[in-house]
Amino acid sequence: GCVDTLTFGSETGDTAPLMHCAEYLHSDVFNSDIRPEVAKGVSFAAARTEAVKKALGAETAELLTKPNCILGIEYCKAILSLNSNIVPQTVQRIAIDHDSDKAHGAFASSSLIRSKSAEGEEISSYVPENTAVCIRALQKEKQYPASLSYLDRAVLAAVSAMPLEDLRRVPDVSEGIENRILAAAETAETCTGLFDAVKTKRYSHARIRRIVLSAYLGITNDLPNLPPYLRILGMTSCGAEILHKAKPMLPIIARPADVKKLSLEARRVFELEVRADNLYSLCTEHRRPANMDYTEKLIRI
C-alpha cells in the first residue's frame, strides 16, 4: 500500500502512551491478567481498565476513560495486529469533551450539534458551511435527523419472534443474555425500554443495542472479522491517484456493477451493508427509496 501515517484525534495529544497501552492490550499477558477481573462480574470495559491499572499504572488506565483515546488505542492495536509499518500520530482534542452538552466558542461536540439541529437550532457556527448546507437540505427533505423510534415496533416484533438458537449466533451474545433479551422483548414498548431492561453491570447499554440491531439486521458471528472488500463512496483526483498506485489487497467497489465481481462471502457482507442503509432510511420522517447502494454513483470532487 501507499499509506504510511494514520492521524487521529485524542484527549491526550501524545501517541506514545496510547501505543504503550495498545502493546499491553495486544499481549498474552493482558489475556491472562483480565481473567480474574472479569470473574468479579464487572463489564469487560471495567475489567480491562483495572487490569491496565495494575499492570501499567493509574495514569495509563485513565486513558481508557476517554472516548477518543479508547478509539486511538484500538487504531494502535490494529496496526500491531496487522504488523503494519503505518505510524500513528494524534492531534489533541481541545475546548470541549466528547458528548459535552455545552459549546465553547466555535467548538461543540457532535452530540450537541445533532441535538441542536434536531431541535431546529442554528448550527452554522459549529460546522463548516458546506456541512451546514447539506444538513439544511436533508432537513428540508425530512431525511434528517434519524431516530430509531420509527422502528420500535418492527424491531421488537422481529426480536421477540426470533428462535433462541438464532439469537445465540448474533455477535456479542454470551452467558445467557439472549434469554434476558427475549424476555424483555415480550413486554418492552420501545427499543430504549428493551435496552434498559436488559442492561447489567457486565452488559452495557451500547452492547445490548448492538446485539438487538445485529439480530434485526441478520448479522451473525460467522461473518469475516475483516472487511472482504473496499468500498469507495467518493474521491478527489488525488484520491484516484492513490488508488491507482496502491497495491490492491482487496476487491474495490467503486460502481454498483463491481458488486457482481465479489465472492459469495463478500457479497453477503455487502447485502448486509445495504440492509443497514435501508434500515437507516426508515428511521427518518421521509424515507429514501430502498437499495440505493446499487444505483448511486461514485462522487468525484
Per-range role (PLM):
Residues 1-301:
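Active-site cores that bind ATP or allylic diphosphates and position pyrophosphate for catalysis
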